Regions:
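Conserved active-site segments centered on acidic
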Residues: 82-136
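N-terminal structured subdomain of primase-like DNA metabolism proteins
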Residues: 1-101, 339, 346
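Short, conserved phosphate-binding/catalytic loop or strand-edge motifs used
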Residues: 55-56, 89, 93, 101-102, ...
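Conserved catalytic cores of soluble enzyme domains
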Residues: 76, 244, 276-328, 335-348
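Conserved phosphate/pyrophosphate-binding and hydrolysis machinery centered on Walker-type P-loop NTPases
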Residues: 11-14, 104-114, 131-134, 153-157, ...
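A general alpha-helix detector
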Residues: 20, 67-71, 120-124, 136, ...
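C-terminal or mid-to-C-terminal helical accessory/interaction module adjacent to the motor/catalytic core
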Residues: 321-383
Length: 383
């Protein structure tokens, strides 16, 4: 694409790099520059610098550097055209009709179309919640004491399909959204008769959905498939709000209900993985904002196993980790409803060091009253 150099320079000069970078990672001023943990490689000590005078960034650890355009392209996985458009919009500068390659144009147009379809779907689900169709969903949210129920999907197999179709989108675009299943019988809504939770990225765009059954049924949770705008392993539910929290940690939990309950109780640093086991990408995403993570998974066997796995992933990412004890409740949602926010804050304050947690869980596998068992236990711990 071609944009006059003077217009590119104007867009650059009207987007302060410190503002752009600090909206995505935490920075601290040292001398005339700002420093933070590099978002492009794992490190424990801040070596990522941003110079307001030079309007440049540079990492002394990995060598990554550049201006506001290159930072946005690298961090948000954008093309130059997309980064230029985002910064122009932010500065209130109207771009002239520009030339993109066919591939760039098609990719950009498709991403924007899928964002628009997702936004329309979120509106539709919210609308249904206020109709007779949403009676059961409203009762469900009230029972769970959730004040911000976000929507409900229709009972029929093609409610959303016809709604989106009538908005002027074609089947090719709708298929790319992941909201519909196409087979020999035609098109069907992926989500039916479920309470719906829009998944919003750190740029506040709807990238997908999670749906939960209101009674019996499998799967209990159903998520959007991966699409051109939705990568499960590189996003976290609730991070769009948690990244702006004033807390110096992030709480990782299992489900949407846990996140919503925590946010309502004032713990707006809570996030959840998106129907998958925690990934390295999600750990690195968290690392962009904080150094400390509190693991708050379910207190049952699978939750304990998931906690142990998460501790290893966070450790490899260079994050400090503690574990919140939810017993005698199953999860944070149940705990907060039973004991309240103050009691939950006490559990946060008393969170267990991750190494001590690992040792305590490992201890269950050995008879420490038996010399051989005790020896085996200490050998295992020392590995």
């Amino acid at each position: 694409m071609y944009i006059p150099d003077d217009l590119v320079e104007e867009i650059r000069s009207r987007n302060d790099i410190v503002d752009i970078v600090s909206s995505r990672i935490k920075l601290q001023k040292k001398g005339s520059s700002y420093f933070g943990l590099c978002p492009f490689h794992n490190e424990k000590s801040p070596s990522f610098s941003v110079s307001p005078n030079k309007q440049m960034f540079y990492c002394f650890g990995c060598g990554e550097g550049g201006n506001v355009f290159s930072f946005l392209m690298k961090y948000d996985n954008l093309t130059f055209s997309e980064a230029l458009k985002e910064l122009a919009d932010r500065a209130g500068i109207e771009l002239p009709d520009v030339r993109m390659s066919a591939e760039e144009r098609n990719r950009s147009d498709l991403k924007n179309t899928v964002y628009d379809i997702n936004k329309e779907a979120a509106r539709y689900y919210h609308y249904l919640l206020e109709t007779e169709t949403g009676n059961n969903a409203r009762a469900y949210f009230n029972k769970r004491e959730l004040s911000n129920g976000l929507g409900v999907s229709g009972i029929k197999s093609d409610d959303l399909y016809h709604y989106i179709k009538n908005k002027g989108y074609n089947d090719g675009q709708m298929k790319e959204s992941g909201l519909f299943i196409y087979d020999e019988k035609g098109a069907h809504d992926r989500f039916r008769n479920r309470v719906m939770f829009p998944i919003i990225n750190t740029n506040n765009k709807v990238i997908g959905f999670g749906g939960r059954v209101m009674g019996e049924g499998q799967p209990k949770y159903l998520n959007s498939p991966e699409t051109i705008v939705f990568d499960k392993g590189r996003n976290l539910y609730g991070l769009n709000a948690a990244k702006n929290s004033r807390k110096n940690n992030i709480i990782i939990c299992e489900g949407y209900m846990d996140v919503i309950s925590m946010h309502q109780a004032g713990f707006n640093q809570a996030v959840a993985s998106l129907g998958t086991a925690l990934t390295d990408g999600q750990a690195n995403l968290i690392k962009r904002y904080v150094k400390d993570v509190l693991v708050c998974y379910d207190s049952d066997g699978p939750g304990t196993k998931a906690s142990l796995r998460a501790i290893g992933i966070f450790r490899n990412a260079g994050l400090r980790t503690k574990v919140i004890n939810m017993e005698p409740c199953k999860d944070a949602d149940e705990f907060i409803k039973t004991y309240g926010a103050d009691a939950f804050q006490k559990r946060i304050d008393d969170a267990e060091n991750s190494f001590l947690y690992e040792v305590r869980i490992l201890e269950r596998n050995y008879d420490l009253n038996d010399p051989a068992g005790k020896t085996s236990f200490f050998n295992e711990v020392s590995v």
